[in-house]
Structure formats: C-alpha cells, structure tokens
Design a protein with these regions (language model features):
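N-terminal Rossmann-like dinucleotide-binding module
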Residues: 1-51
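Rossmann-fold dehydrogenase core element
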Residues: 2, 113-130, 150-157
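Beta-loop-alpha module in the N-terminal Rossmann-like domain of NAD(P)-dependent dehydrogenases
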Residues: 16, 56-117
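C-terminal capping/lid region of NAD(P)-dependent oxidoreductase domains
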Residues: 123, 150-154, 337-365
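Predominantly a Rossmann-like dinucleotide-binding segment in NAD(P)-dependent oxidoreductases
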Residues: 131-217, 341
Length: 365
C-alpha cells in the first residue's frame, strides 16, 4: 500500500481525493498540509466519507513536518504554482515520489531541476495533465501513432473561457507573475500539453501575442501562440479568460492528409468531428463519455493509476516530468516572445521565468 500526502488543499483537492480513493487497492491518504487548518479538516472529512471509514490523517500546517510524523511514498503538490518547485524539490530530495498539479514550475531552470533531481534519486515525477487519459484523446493518439491520419499538417487548440473578477479576488495570487501567470499558463496549459503530445515533434520556434484587456491582474487575460516544428508542422493555441458571458469552448483539432479530428466537450472529452479515411464517423460521434462535473474532467483517477503502475513496473509515468517541462517551456517562450516582439528559437532558449515578465516591460498591443 502506497502512502499519499496532499500539499495544498485548494479547489482542485477534491479531485485529488477522488483519484486516491478510486485507487484504494494500492493507495491511501495518510497526511495533508495547508496553511489554513479548516481546509485540512474538510479534506479529512471528505476522504473519510468516500472510503466509509473514520481513519484519521495527519494534518500539518508546515509540510516539512509530515515526513517527521509518517512514512510517505507519494506527495501530491497542489499549492499556488509559484511554490511547486520548492516543495517538489524538498520531497524529491527526501526520497519521496512526486505528482505536481500543473504547471511543473514557473521557470525553465526550476522545471529542469525537478526533472534532474527525480532522475538522480531514482524517483518518479509526474505532472497532472490528466486530460491525456480522456478516452477520445487516447483514441486520437492511437490513430496518429498508427498513421491513420497520414502526414500531420497542423493542430489547433482553443480555450475560450471566462474567469470573472471574483475568481481573482477569491485568491489574490491568481494572475500574478510570481505565483500563477496568465490564461496561457493557468487555463491553457492542458491543451498546450495535448497539442504538443499529438504533434510529437521537435519545436523550432514559438511566437506569441498576448494582452490584458479587462481583468485587474498582472498577467494576460488573452493570448495566441504559434508553434512551428522542425518538420514543418504548425500548431496554434488561442486562450481567453474573458469570453462573455460564460465558457464557450475547449477544443483540440488535428488535421492530416487523410484525416481531421476535433475533440471538444467540457474538458476535451467529446468527439465533435472524426473524418478519418476508412473510419465510420457516426460510430465515433456516438461515443458518449458524458460531461464531467467540472473542467477538471475525469482524468485524475487514471493518472494516479498510471503513476502507481509506473512505480510497480519501474517505468516512467505517461505524463512525466519531461512532459511537464515541455509544456512550461512553450508558455515561457510565448511570454518572452510577447516581451521582445520576436519569435523564440527553442534551441537557443535556455533561461526564463515568469518573474522576468514585469508588467511595465510587457508590450500589450
């Protein structure tokens, strides 16, 4: 049985609890940490209800005290994004496997340090890009690997959502360069991971334009990224947190010489278009995975199962630290592109952080 702890008991934590409970044959929650004690009580109560047991868990406001009290196999980090690197390194340096909610880190150096530390200590590191496990996404990846879409030309990701002023007021760290970033880093990173996974190619350049139109935050509330791959493929990402009056769409589109696929739904969980040579589109459109109760989707259970299996089989998780690094690198390159007004050559892109994005330096057009 693997002992899990949760660091940070915010709005995503109920999904984390679900993921652990749904893998209860091999995983159990033994501890939590948060600076607000009542949030830890809420997580304990929720976990007890879901496993139908009054089994208590260790609660510490200082996450470092958990290792002094209990044996820990896996730490799940779901704090403000700006703390992911520090906390992740602490657990990895103390022999604990780590799952980090997106993003992996807020700098290229920090993300690389996490990946390197996990490798050095022979530990597993995963990032919660849980939408990779959605059934329609798995079908698309399989079709691409089998070359059923032929040569891939381009991909498009659109995340057209709304995050009103209350969203940012509820947690003042949101939208800050130090702890969060803007809509590209926060809302769009899952689809950025997906499109890069589907393209499965080395990136040549990243170019972006972003703006802050109406939200009272440091970072962008709208952005567009253009990625050119070394093979010639092109991917575009459009992200918005200011769609009126409510979320409009989250879609992933892949086009190739023999196929076009569009996946949408609340959390890229529904096939909207499946026009692939030799396939019956109606059969694919009839696949009903149902809408989840939030944009977090269904993937945490499968992501945690894959992580547990990776530990058992001594292999890399599907969404390992390197995958998390690649997603962060794309977004940070987009931020640097906005700051400089130039496309960023990825092979020459070494060091950058959201902290380099002081608002006064950003050219919002």
């Amino acid at each position: 049985m693997l002992n899990f702890v949760i660091i940070g008991c915010g709005r995503i934590s109920y999904k984390i609890v679900d993921g652990i409970v749904n893998n209860k044959e091999k995983a159990r929650l033994v501890g939590v940490s948060d600076i607000v004690f009542s949030k830890m009580d809420e997580i304990e109560f929720e976990y007890q209800n879901k496993i139908n047991s009054k089994e208590t868990i260790v609660k510490k406001e200082n996450y470092k005290e958990l290792l002094e009290s209990i044996s820990v196999d896996v730490a799940i980090i779901s704090t403000e994004s700006g703390y992911h690197e520090e906390i992740g390194l602490y657990f990895l340096e103390n022999g604990v496997n780590v799952i980090i909610e997106k993003p992996l880190a807020m700098s290229i150096e920090g993300a690389r340090k996490l990946v390197d530390t996990a490798k050095k200590n022979n530990l597993k590191l995963a990032v919660s890009h849980q939408n990779r496990f959605n059934y329609p996404i798995q079908l698309l990846k399989k079709a691409i690997k089998e070359n059923r879409l032929g040569k891939i030309f381009n991909g498009m990701a659109r995340i057209l959502w709304t995050r009103d002023d209350n969203y940012y007021l509820q947690a003042p760290w949101r939208g800050t360069w130090a702890l969060d970033g803007g809509t590209l880093m926060n809302q769009c990173i899952h689809n950025i991971d997906l499109i890069n996974w589907m393209m499965d190619d080395e990136i040549d350049t990243v170019y972006a334009q972003t703006s802050n139109y109406i939200r009272n935050i440091e970072a962008e509330d709208y952005g567009v990224i253009l990625i050119r791959y070394k093979s010639g493929k092109i991917a575009t990402i459009e992200g918005s947190a200011i769609v009126y009056p409510k979320n409009l769409e989250e879609t992933l589109t892949i086009t190739g010489e023999k196929g076009t696929v569009v996946i949408g739904g609340m959390a890229v969980n529904k096939i909207n278009t499946w026009r692939v040579e030799g396939d019956n589109e109606a059969e694919y459109l009839s696949i009903d995975c149902g809408d989840p109760n939030s944009v977090y989707g269904y993937g945490h259970e499968a992501l945690y199962k894959d992580f547990v299996d990776a530990l058992d089989e001594n292999r890399e998780p599907l969404v390992n630290g390197k995958a998390g690094l690649e997603a962060v690198k794309i977004i940070l390159a987009a931020y640097k592109s906005q700051k400089t007004g130039l496309p960023i050559k990825i092979s020459e892109f070494k060091g950058f952080s959201t902290l380099d994005m002081e608002k006064k330096d950003v050219k919002y057009l």
